[in-house]
């Protein structure tokens, strides 16, 4: 009986994924699409866009950073939502 109870507790912990972390895209506009598992506590993804002599640059990653004026920032809170 104790073995069954212990097994149920272990299965419950594994299924609940108590250490859940967010997954976000983390590639720049000119790079192949890649993802990153964010650090614990980072619950959002961002998409940051700006223009320079190379054209429009898009940067993606975990978190929701503070940006300078003239930089477009979008933050979201679901899996790989920052494409």
Swiss-Prot record:
Changing residue 59 to L: 25-fold decrease in potency of inhibition of Torpedo marmorata acetylcholine receptor. Changing residue 56 to A: No change in potency of inhibition of Torpedo marmorata acetylcholine receptor. Residues 1-21 form the signal peptide. One of its GO terms (cellular component) is extracellular region. Residues 24-38 are annotated as: Loop I. The record marks 29, 31, 48, 54 as: Key residue for binding to acetylcholine receptor. It is found in: Secreted. Coiled coil: none annotated. Changing residue 69 to Q: No change in potency of inhibition of Torpedo marmorata acetylcholine receptor. Keywords: Acetylcholine receptor inhibiting toxin, Disulfide bond, Ion channel impairing toxin, Neurotoxin, Postsynaptic neurotoxin, Secreted, Signal, Toxin. Changing residue 35 to A: 2.7-fold decrease in potency of inhibition of Torpedo marmorata acetylcholine receptor. Changing residue 73 to A: 1.4-fold decrease in potency of inhibition of Torpedo marmorata acetylcholine receptor. The record marks 27, 30, 46, 53, 55 as: Moderately important residue for binding to acetylcholine receptor. One of its GO terms (molecular function) is ion channel regulator activity. SUPFAM superfamilies: Snake toxin-like. Changing residue 31 to A: 210-fold decrease in potency of inhibition of Torpedo marmorata acetylcholine receptor. It holds the Pfam family Toxin_cobra-type. This is Erabutoxin a. It comes from Laticauda semifasciata.
């Amino acid at each position: 009986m104790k073995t069954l109870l212990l097994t149920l507790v272990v299965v419950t912990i594994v299924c609940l994924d108590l250490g859940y972390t967010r997954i976000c895209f983390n590639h720049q506009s000119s790079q192949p699409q890649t993802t990153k598992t964010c650090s614990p506590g980072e619950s959002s993804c961002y998409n940051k866009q700006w223009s320079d002599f190379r054209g429009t640059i898009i940067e993606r990653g975990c978190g929701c950073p503070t940006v300078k004026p003239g930089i477009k920032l979008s933050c979201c809170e679901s899996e790989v939502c920052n494409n």
